[in-house]
Amino acid sequence: MQQDLAGRVALVTGAGAGIGRATARALAARGAIVGVNDLKQELVDAAVADITAAGGKAFAVVQNVATREGIGQAVRQAAEHGSRFDILVNNAAWVRYQSAAEIQDDTMDRMLDIGFKAVIWGIQAAAEAMDPERGGAIVNVASTAALKSAPASMVYSGIKAGVLGITRAAAAELGGRGIRVNAVCPSAVPTEGTQRNRNAERDARRIASTPMGRLGTVEDVASGIAFLASDEARFITAQALVVDGGITFTTL
């Protein structure tokens, strides 16, 4: 693995499991010093141990990034591990799928706090921490649900579509400072968090409708994020990289 991120300081929110944990591993494998964020100390410690055992560099950031203060503190804590702060991956989310009739204030508020507001507060904090001469990279984890939706996903789809809007607006505003802002849009990826919404029949339909003939993995998504965070994507900003094996824009 090329060490193209050597010495750069990164923060991945929601990195105790799933896409976030795989992303932390991918960035560390490319040489980054990675802040692993989650709410649960045991998840963070396990992820950090996983990275260090593989020869990477990582540190724990146990903060509630659903608040402006929490994500700000997480970024500041990460910045203390190097001479600058370079990469933010806004990955944290809390998801519930409900029909239009079932949506409640508390569910929607929590999803908005973690999946929408935290993205804005994270960008704000990262932009302040990044070196104005060197810039940096921000990658927001959206979803193919922002592009093509399904029943019982009104709140989720709306939030992820909003993340794409935030991404483009932030890219326009921060590009002059050398800060690139992009998003990834994964399709349904098997993780610990998505287990409750999966079943064999639905997975089989998705596989049959996917040109690549399989479900995506957390490593597939992490590779896309690592690319967008790297200098290989130095002239790429305001983009949404769809990581879905082709299912969103094809019909089989």
Q: What label would you give each PLM region?
A:
Residues 101, 148-154, 176-177, 213, ...:
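Active-site loop immediately N-terminal to the catalytic Tyr-X3-Lys motif
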